[in-house]
């Protein structure tokens, strides 16, 4: 039985919860090998029994049988299309419709946000916010997509009165790192945690007595070992990707948390500065 085809064609027959299950299975069929009914139920906010009943409605004995059948169908389909379909990003191929691409991208980003927020140590995050709030000077380092995340954070921090350097040039990043002092903070953003330039800057900052805060993945890495504090980010992207989409989503969620936490710590003055910034930029229009 072609379950993927049956799921695609039976949309009008599904209840609200069944449609949630169908959408999830279609968007994540390439990753079902590692998905259990318990995980799926938790992510979708439904009961495990709803998933079992959905599988039985399609003609399978239970979720395990449906999952294995879908994996088999997906593998067979991939073998047929691999000769012509180009792999564009993670599980997205050139044969996917824009609607399927949208679902896959949205789910990838949703998972990055959910998993990153679930794994954050919020007591550690509060401590990091307090450390940053007392820093005379903050340096933010990053490369590529991580540099974009860093630049966004630097703008936010400057808006509420922090002295921040966030340079794109790696030579300048290294130069700033060696001039940091005790009490200063370096926020190093690198998902891999192994980029030579970022590790070099972290080493220099630590040597000068600055506090190094790494926004990185859970994987053991040189940056993770160097950092005084780490904030973990999770991304489901594979090595085969066209851009760090869900990685940036996870990183932005962490940097936005830092910003809002700092605003909350000094709410009256921060809000005054945000208001003044808004008034000044309005005058430029």
Curated annotation (Swiss-Prot):
Residues 1-77 form the HTH rpiR-type domain. Residues 37-56 bind DNA. SUPFAM superfamilies: Homeodomain-like, SIS domain. Induction: Repressed by itself and by the cAMP receptor protein crp. Pfam families: HTH_6, SIS. Pathway: Amino-sugar metabolism; N-acetylmuramate degradation [regulation]. Disruption phenotype: Cells lacking this gene show an abolition of the extensive lag phase observed when grown on MurNAc and a 20-fold enhancement of murQ transcription. Residues 128-268 form the SIS domain. The keyword Transcription applies. GO terms for biological process: carbohydrate derivative metabolic process; N-acetylmuramic acid catabolic process; negative regulation of DNA-templated transcription; regulation of carbohydrate catabolic process; regulation of DNA-templated transcription. GO terms for molecular function: carbohydrate derivative binding; DNA binding; DNA-binding transcription factor activity. Keywords: Carbohydrate metabolism, DNA-binding, Repressor, Transcription, Transcription regulation. NCBIfam families: PRK15482.1. Homotetramer. Neither GlcNAc-6-P, GlcNAc, anhydroMurNAc, MurNAc, nor muramyl dipeptide have an effect on MurR binding to the operator site. Represses the expression of the murPQ operon involved in the uptake and degradation of N-acetylmuramic acid (MurNAc). Binds to two adjacent inverted repeats within the operator region. MurNAc 6-phosphate, the substrate of MurQ, is the specific inducer that weakens binding of MurR to the operator. Also represses its own transcription. This is HTH-type transcriptional regulator MurR.
């Amino acid at each position: 039985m072609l379950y993927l085809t049956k799921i695609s064609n039976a949309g009008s027959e599904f209840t609200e919860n069944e449609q949630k299950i169908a959408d999830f299975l279609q968007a994540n069929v390439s990753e079902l090998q590692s998905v259990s009914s318990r995980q799926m139920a938790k992510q979708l906010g439904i009961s495990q029994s709803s998933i079992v009943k959905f599988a039985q409605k399609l003609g399978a004995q239970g979720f395990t049988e449906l999952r294995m059948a879908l994996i088999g169908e997906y593998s067979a389909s991939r073998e047929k299309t691999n000769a012509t379909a180009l792999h564009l990003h993670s599980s997205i191929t050139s044969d996917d419709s824009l609607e399927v691409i949208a679902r896959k991208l949205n789910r990838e980003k949703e998972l990055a946000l959910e998993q990153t927020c679930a794994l954050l140590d919020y007591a550690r995050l509060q401590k990091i916010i307090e450390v940053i709030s007392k820093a005379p000077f903050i340096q933010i380092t990053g490369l590529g997509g991580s540099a974009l995340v860093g630049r966004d954070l630097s703008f936010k921090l400057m808006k509420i009165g922090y002295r921040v350097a966030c340079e794109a040039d790696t030579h300048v990043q290294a130069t700033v790192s060696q001039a940091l002092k005790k009490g200063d903070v370096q926020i190093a953003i690198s998902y891999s945690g192994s980029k030579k330039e970022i590790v070099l800057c972290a080493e220099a900052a630590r040597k000068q007595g600055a506090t190094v805060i790494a926004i990185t993945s859970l994987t053991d890495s040189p940056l993770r070992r160097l950092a005084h504090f780490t904030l973990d980010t999770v991304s489901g992207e594979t090595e085969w990707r066209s851009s760090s989409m869900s990685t940036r989503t996870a990183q932005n969620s962490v940097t936005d948390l830092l910003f809002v936490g700092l605003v909350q710590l000094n709410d009256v003055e921060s809000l005054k500065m945000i208001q003044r910034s808004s008034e000044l930029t309005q005058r430029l229009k």
